[in-house]
């Protein structure tokens, strides 16, 4: 009996020994596999699940106030750049534009009259100058006659009455020359006044054109057009809504504007650089694989841009690992239409690329 019991004991010991060695071998194999995986795979990747899909959202806002007369799009609709999205009540702006255009027309007509008056004034100056030339010729002729008559009077050839006659003509010629010169001065003054008035009128026309352009801009702004091609979201108006400048009417997600913002720990970015490949997994579609590339790094940690950045100079210091936002461009994919801003993402950077 003792031999049988001893044999069973030895058999059990050997079995336990084999099991122990088997378990130890499996654990050792896993350990070696883990070490090999770390050295050949894991240490070349940095991952984070603190990542989200983002987009350069374009907010559409009106430039003028008014009631929405027509709404030409629906929420989630695809639109093209320059497409009319809504039409605001433009009757007031149309009336102001028409009035400003009438003012411009009136002032331009007045400018035409002014230019005609200037033309007449120049003709008057030419005519007055002709009168001066004629008066100067008469005066020169009569002056010679006057001087000749003076000599004849001294010699007693003519009577005093004859001399006074030519003297009267000579004085009249002097008066006529003065009158002609005064007419030239008056015509030139009139032209100067007209030219000054024209300068003022031109300034008024320029100002009127500026007002007309402003009203034209306001009138054109009654049509709300899409600044980019993309997809409508967050539609906040309907027909009959009253809007004002800086009111957010809707958002547009531009085409090809999606990217991932991954917030890596500061201890993870040592070997990261722009252009490295990134594997992306969306929580919404875990079976789909997306890829991307590092596009840029934030100039500061996320906490730096918060409304209340941490102040570690107060003496109450707790060291916290900071997060650095990394922008990742998403590569083209057949399933890119499934990617929406705000989705959660797991990002894994391949440090070997």
UniProtKB/Swiss-Prot annotation:
<keyword id="KW-1133">Transmembrane helix</keyword>
<dbReference type="InterPro" id="IPR043602">
    <property type="entry name" value="CusB-like_dom_1"/>
</dbReference>
<keyword id="KW-0813">Transport</keyword>
<feature type="transmembrane region" description="Helical">
    <location>
        <begin position="21"/>
        <end position="41"/>
    </location>
</feature>
<dbReference type="InterPro" id="IPR050739">
    <property type="entry name" value="MFP"/>
</dbReference>
<dbReference type="GO" id="GO:0005886">
    <property type="term" value="C:plasma membrane"/>
</dbReference>
<feature type="coiled-coil region">
    <location>
        <begin position="132"/>
        <end position="204"/>
    </location>
</feature>
<comment type="similarity">
    <text>Belongs to the membrane fusion protein (MFP) (TC 8.A.1) family.</text>
</comment>
<dbReference type="GO" id="GO:0046677">
    <property type="term" value="P:response to antibiotic"/>
</dbReference>
<dbReference type="Pfam" id="PF13437">
    <property type="entry name" value="HlyD_3"/>
</dbReference>
<keyword id="KW-1003">Cell membrane</keyword>
<dbReference type="Pfam" id="PF00529">
    <property type="entry name" value="CusB_dom_1"/>
</dbReference>
<protein>
    <recommendedName>
        <fullName>Colistin resistance protein EmrA</fullName>
    </recommendedName>
</protein>
<keyword id="KW-0046">Antibiotic resistance</keyword>
<keyword id="KW-0175">Coiled coil</keyword>
<comment type="function">
    <text>Probably part of an efflux pump system that contributes to adaptation to osmotic stress and resistance to colistin.</text>
</comment>
<dbReference type="GO" id="GO:0055085">
    <property type="term" value="P:transmembrane transport"/>
</dbReference>
<keyword id="KW-0472">Membrane</keyword>
<keyword id="KW-0812">Transmembrane</keyword>
<keyword id="KW-0997">Cell inner membrane</keyword>
């Amino acid at each position: 009996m003792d031999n049988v019991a001893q044999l069973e004991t030895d058999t059990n010991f050997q079995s336990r020994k084999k099991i122990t060695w088997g378990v130890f071998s499996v654990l050792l194999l896993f350990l070696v596999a883990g070490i090999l995986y770390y050295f050949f795979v894991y240490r070349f990747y940095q991952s984070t699940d603190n990542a989200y899909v983002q987009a350069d959202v374009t907010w559409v806002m009106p430039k003028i106030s008014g009631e929405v007369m027509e709404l030409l799009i629906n929420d989630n609709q695809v639109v093209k750049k320059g497409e009319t999205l809504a039409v605001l009540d433009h009757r007031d702006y149309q009336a102001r534009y028409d009035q400003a255009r009438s003012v411009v027309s009136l002032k331009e007509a007045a400018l035409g009259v002014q230019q005609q008056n200037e033309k007449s004034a120049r003709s008057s100056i030419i005519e007055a100058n002709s009168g001066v030339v004629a008066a100067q010729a008469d005066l020169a002729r009569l002056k010679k006659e006057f001087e000749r008559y003076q000599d004849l009077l001294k010699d007693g050839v003519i009577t005093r009455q004859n001399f006074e006659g030519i003297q009267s003509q000579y004085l009249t010629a002097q008066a006529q020359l003065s009158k002609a010169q005064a007419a030239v001065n008056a015509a030139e003054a009139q032209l100067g006044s007209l030219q000054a008035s024209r300068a003022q009128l031109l300034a008024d026309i320029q100002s009127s054109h500026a007002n007309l352009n402003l009203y034209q801009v306001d009138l054109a702004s009654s049509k709300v057009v899409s600044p980019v091609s993309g997809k409508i979201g967050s539609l906040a108006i309907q027909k009959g809504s009253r809007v004002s400048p800086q009111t957010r009417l809707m958002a547009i997600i531009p085409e090809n504007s999606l990217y991932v913002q991954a917030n890596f720990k500061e201890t993870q970015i040592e070997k990261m650089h722009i252009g490295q490949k990134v594997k992306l997994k969306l929580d919404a579609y875990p079976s789909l694989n997306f890829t991307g590339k590092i596009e840029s790094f934030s100039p500061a940690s996320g906490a730096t841009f918060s409304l209340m950045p941490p102040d570690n100079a107060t003496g109450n210091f707790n060291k916290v690992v900071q997060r650095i936002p990394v922008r990742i461009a998403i590569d083209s994919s057949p399933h890119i239409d499934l990617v929406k801003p705000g989705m959660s993402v797991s990002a894994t950077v391949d440090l070997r690329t």
